[in-house]
Regions:
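A structural micro-motif
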Residues: 1, 27, 49-50, 87-88, ...
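NAD(P)+-binding Rossmann beta1-loop-alpha1 motif at the extreme N-terminus of oxidoreductases
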Residues: 1-53, 57, 178-181
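Solvent-exposed alpha-helices and their adjacent loops that cap or buttress functional pockets
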Residues: 4, 23, 82-83, 104-105, ...
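A general structural signal for well-ordered alpha-helical segments in protein cores
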Residues: 12, 39, 62, 74, ...
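Rossmann-like NAD(P)(H) cofactor-binding subdomain of soluble oxidoreductases
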Residues: 15, 38, 45, 54-129
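Small-residue helix-packing motif on alpha-helices
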Residues: 29, 39, 58, 74, ...
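Internal alpha-helical scaffold of NAD(P)-dependent oxidoreductase catalytic cores
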Residues: 100-110, 125-159, 163-207, 247-255
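NAD(P)-dependent Rossmann-like dehydrogenase/reductase catalytic/cofactor-binding core
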Residues: 194, 198-256
């Protein structure tokens, strides 16, 4: 299997790192040099990875094509590229919907939208795909947990929640900075906060049948967790989180 990546940002990097360390059998990975630094890092990391400057040559050389560019760049260059029916085309582009992708690609190839996140480099996390595709599902199951979505409108909800990655990291950063200001060394602060949230995430994953129950069980009457969650609710933290999600969803729905 020969794979081609149009766009070499952080997501492409994470996906490729996951592929290299997985059981996926591939003979070659061709990457563009849109991000010269990342492209060079990847090509040096594995002999099977080669940089090709011409996007069309990448497409001509592979069976699977991954579109990992911004929406603005995607709308500009995809329609100029020539695809074939044999191609399996996987788009990581958030706001270019299937109808527009088909219009740009022109041929009746297998086209799938996917939502990979950075932990895919560790072969962890969910990878929502639309529409369901057996080959693509098998591929991504080597890199995490594939979630098949039958309705594109429903898939927008998954794109929305994936936008909470940066806010999550901002929470980790804010809490680690708070510890640092209280006199804790940076390394210790970051290690504690990240380890704490990893443990909480694993615990919630193993008990995910009822997240609301977890919220209740993690509090004791007049305890510290009860105080924190009550104060954050009063401040509108969770209400604003919902508002932000709705705002992101509206943006995705407006995209053509």
């Amino acid at each position: 299997m020969k794979l081609g990546f149009i766009g070499t940002g952080e997501i492409s990097k994470a996906v490729i790192q996951g592929i290299i360390s997985s059981k996926i059998k591939f003979s070659k990975i061709y990457i563009s040099n849109r991000n010269n630094k990342i492209s060079k890092q990847l090509s040096k990391s594995n002999k099977k990875i080669s940089i090709i400057k011409d996007n069309q040559k990448i497409i001509d050389a592979c069976e699977w094509v991954f579109l990992a560019i911004t929406p603005a760049v995607g709308k500009k260059i995809i329609k100029e590229l020539k695809f074939k029916k044999k191609h399996t085309i996987i788009s990581f582009i958030s706001t270019i919907k299937m109808k527009e992708l088909k219009k740009f690609i022109k041929v009746k190839a297998a086209i799938v939208r996917a939502i990979p996140l950075p932990p895919i480099s560790l072969k962890k996390g969910p990878i929502p795909i639309y529409p369901p595709n057996k080959k693509v599902k098998r591929f991504f199951n080597n890199l995490g947990t594939t979630v098949e979505i039958k309705n594109e409108a429903l898939s927008l909800n998954f794109w929305t929640t994936s936008s909470m990655m940066a806010p999550f990291y901002e929470i980790l950063y804010t809490l680690s900075q708070w510890l640092i200001k209280k006199g804790v060394k940076k390394e210790s602060a970051q290690k504690y906060i990240t380890s704490l949230f990893v443990a909480l995430s694993e615990d919630s994953f193993n008990k995910s049948s009822d997240l609301k129950k977890l919220v209740k069980e993690s509090q004791t009457p007049k305890g510290l967790n009860e105080q924190s969650v009550k104060e954050l609710r009063k401040l509108g933290f969770y209400r604003d989180l919902n508002k932000t999600a709705e705002s992101v969803l509206r943006r995705l729905k407006k995209a053509k």
